[in-house]
Structures are given as C-alpha cells and as structure tokens.
Regions:
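Catalytic domains that recognize anionic headgroups
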Residues: 1-452
C-alpha cells in the first residue's frame, strides 16, 4: 500500500468541451489545463446513471446505479470511499456547497471525520429575509408558474449579503479546502479530501470580472436560471447570453480551482498526493433544441465528462486514454493506484489505471447511461451513439467520429449498427435474477422492494 494523500475535486455540470485540455479555444481555463498537462486525461468518461445524486453514489461506492437505484440517500449497507480510507488510517473530510448531498437524511457524510456544508446554493432553503431585488428582472412570462422561479427567488435571498468575489460559492468552497489542507498537512497522517463544488451548475451568476463572454450590449432579462425543456421560449440573443454566463462561470471556477491547486503546491503536497478532477455531467445549452438537463437530452454536451488523474510521481503525465470509462470506475482506479485493488472486489466498477499502464485495452464494449425513472437510454461505444426512445418517438444513431456534435441521425443508413447497440439494452436491463437459497428466501425476495 502506498500512503499517498487523495484529493478529489468535483465540479458539478462542467462540460468537457469547455476546457482547453479537451480542445476548447474560447473559454479560458488555464489552471485546469495545467493540471491536465500533469495528469492522465480520459477522453471518453461517462456517468452511468444521471444526474447529481446517482453519480455521487457511483463515485462514493464504486457501484453502478442504473438501473438499480434512483435518486436516493446512501444506504447504511453501502461501503463508501471515506469508510474504506478511514479504516486504513486516513483522515477523511468532505467540503461542499452541493446542497443535495447535505440535505437531512441523504447520508453522504457517511465515513467522513469532518463534513463542511457551505449553505445557500440554488434553492437551498437557507435565508428567509427578502433580497430587495426585482424578481421580474430574472424571469420571462414563459417562466411564470415554473419551479425555477422559486429557485431563483431563494438564490437571490441566499446571496443578498455578498460583497466581493470571495463570497461567491466556489471561492468559499476552495477557501475552506485550502484552510483544511493547511491545517491537516501538519499532521503525520494521510488524508482523503473530497472537494465538491456545485459551480458551474446553475444559477449562472459569475463575479463581474468573469462576465466577459456575454454581449456587452445585451439589455434583456438576467436569465441566470432558465427553465428546463425546449428552447422555444427563449430568443437566440438570450440563448447566447445564457451560454456566455455559463462560460464566465467556468472561468471563475477554474480560477478558484487554481488557487486551491496553488495551495497544494505551496505546501509541498504534490509529490505525495493523488489528485482527481472530474464532473458529474455536462449541461445542454440549446445544442439539440433543449436547455438545462432533461431526461431525453442524451447527447455529448450532457454525457461526456472531464476526468483527469494526477499521479504523485508524475507517471504518464499528459497521456490521453480513449477507451470507455464510467463514474463507477473512479474509486476502483484510485484504490488500484494505491495498491489496494483487493478492496474493489465487490465493486461494479473497474480500475481504469489498467488502461493507462497498458495492462488492458478496454474495460467494456459500451457504456449505457440515462435517468433511472426515464425510458430514454443511450448506448455508446467509442465511435457510435445510439439513443433508445419510448414509442412513438424515433430512435437515433450518430457516428461520433464523423459527426461529433451529433447533428445527423444516420439510423436509416446503419440499421445493423443500431441493432447491435440496442441489443446491449436487452442484456443490461433484463430483470435481475437473485440467487435463491430456499423457499423461504424465494418468498422474501419476491415480496420485498429490493427483490422486485
């Protein structure tokens, strides 16, 4: 076992195609790009179950959630990364403003020695005092009656006391993380730190100095949190404004992630700390006719995530790994690098480090992803993406190598490829057949929710 510290940096809703290290030339992300140059970069990383909570469940446990588990708390039987590291003598801490993790009963603090929740993101019911702003400045008539109006109102209440950049959420998360490692680096004990920033998740409200991607002449509504669904209610000018806000949020997050990474370097921790940076999913911005996360928008802007792993010894720095990787592979990969592969035997996920070293050429033939409650599913290999739709909607097939933006549905030209990928759904979503040890157990399995 190698006694490396482990730091995971989760940046919620960060689109892979908005990072320079993945080919973007418009959005400025110098700090994450620098980390990428020191890391192994995974080009085809995907969440297997969406969105926020199922992804964290897979990351924290190494267990697949789709089609087994919906958005739900961690269960007491779940063995979490923090519990594993705690048993190995690590000090474990979670620092987050992702309020879904911290709601009472969600149990995502399980196994951590300390748990710091920065309150106030999005619709977190935190501040009740009025915000003093005109809510009409932030919504259009098409948004009346939509739940996002309440989220915006709560967010404005939560942020009414902000004075400067350091009061914005990602800055507060990273400052807490910097304080934590400064205090704990002095202790002769390895640590596991999970830093979970809800930004660049909506609302998109970056500090003014990062708002450089929007049209300076824009005078419309401040659409920091659009409603979910088709883009037919929003003008092209407004859509470009929203995209600009998101880009500014990404650069803001990159800046404060950079401050945190600088603190790690300043403390001399780079040589004995494994660093993982990733997102849970991306975010649609009208790329395929809808905005925000919806269960039917199973395209790369939502599905493809950034994932990079920096080895303390600088091994394989700058290497790009193309084979398919899932979020349930992340914990097994970390444990494998630490020489703890035996701890992963009961996990669904597999170590992606074997792809890096050349011990394996692939971990799986396809990834299957979607929302637990939805009948829309996406099956992908390294070249193709097949989307299964419920009747009467038409299925879709995209040749990713020739059409990376998924604009041309070629299912009529390649029906055999669509059928090849579709068959994986039949295997993957076949009802589970529990091992029956006795008549009593057969009855109990059939009459309990876990056995249905």
């Amino acid at each position: 076992m190698k006694q490396y510290n482990v730091i995971a940096i989760m940046l919620d809703s960060l689109r892979q195609d908005h990072l320079g290290c993945y080919g973007n030339t418009r959005v400025r992300t110098p700090n994450i790009d620098q980390l990428a140059r020191e890391s192994v970069i995974f080009d085809n990383a995907y969440p297997e179950g969406l969105p926020t909570i199922p992804v964290r469940t897979a990351l924290f446990t190494g267990q697949r959630t789709l089609p087994y588990r919906p958005w739900q708390p961690l269960e007491k039987e779940d063995i979490t990364a923090a519990e594993i590291f705690s048993a190995l003598g690590y000090t474990c801490a979670l620092i987050t403003d992702t309020y879904h993790l911290a709601k009472p009963g969600m149990n995502f603090h399980k196994g951590f020695h300390s748990f710091d929740w920065i309150r106030g993101q999005e619709g977190d019911p935190y501040i009740t005092a009025p915000h003093g702003k005109d809510l009409e400045d932030y919504i259009k008539p098409a948004m009346y009656g939509d739940r996002v109006v309440g989220l915006i109102d709560q967010y404005l209440r939560n942020t009414a006391g902000r004075k400067g950049e350091e009061d914005y959420f990602c800055a507060r998360v990273m400052r807490k993380a910097m304080d934590w490692i400064e205090n704990n680096a002095k202790v002769n004990q390895p640590f596991f730190l999970w830093v979970d920033s809800f930004d660049p998740h909506e609302p998109w409200d970056p500090p003014s100095r990062y708002d450089t991607y929007t049209d300076p002449n824009y005078s419309g509504k401040k659409l920091i949190h659009p409603k979910y669904g088709p883009v037919d209610w929003i003008t092209q000018e407004e859509l470009e404004y929203v995209r600009g806000l998101y880009a500014g949020e990404v650069t803001f997050v990159d800046t404060w992630t950079g401050h945190f990474l600088d603190k790690i370097r300043e403390l001399g921790l780079m040589e004995n700390t494994l660093i993982v940076l990733l997102a849970d999913h991306g975010h649609p911005h009208g790329d395929h006719g809808s905005i925000m996360k919806t269960d039917n928008n199973l395209y790369s802007e939502l599905l493809r995530i950034p994932l990079m792993i920096r080895h303390p010894e600088g091994l394989y720095a700058g290497k790009h790994v193309h084979p398919l990787v899932e979020t349930d592979d992340v914990l097994p990969t970390i444990l494998d690098i630490l020489g703890l592969g035996h701890e992963t035997i009961s996990m669904h996920g597999k170590s992606a480090w074997r792809l890096v070293t050349g011990e394996a050429s692939k971990l799986r033939d396809v990834v299957i992803t979607g929302y637990h409650e939805s009948r829309h599913r996406c099956v992908r290999d390294e070249e193709w993406s097949y989307i299964s739709r419920p009747d009467p909607e038409d299925d879709e097939l995209y040749h990713l190598t020739e059409d990376p933006k998924e604009k041309v549905n070629v299912i009529d030209r390649y029906p055999e490829k669509a059928e090849e990928l579709r068959r994986h759904l039949g295997v993957y979503f076949r009802p589970r057949l529990p091992r029956i040890l006795s008549i009593q157990l057969r009855y109990e399995v059939q009459h309990t929710p876990a056995g249905k």
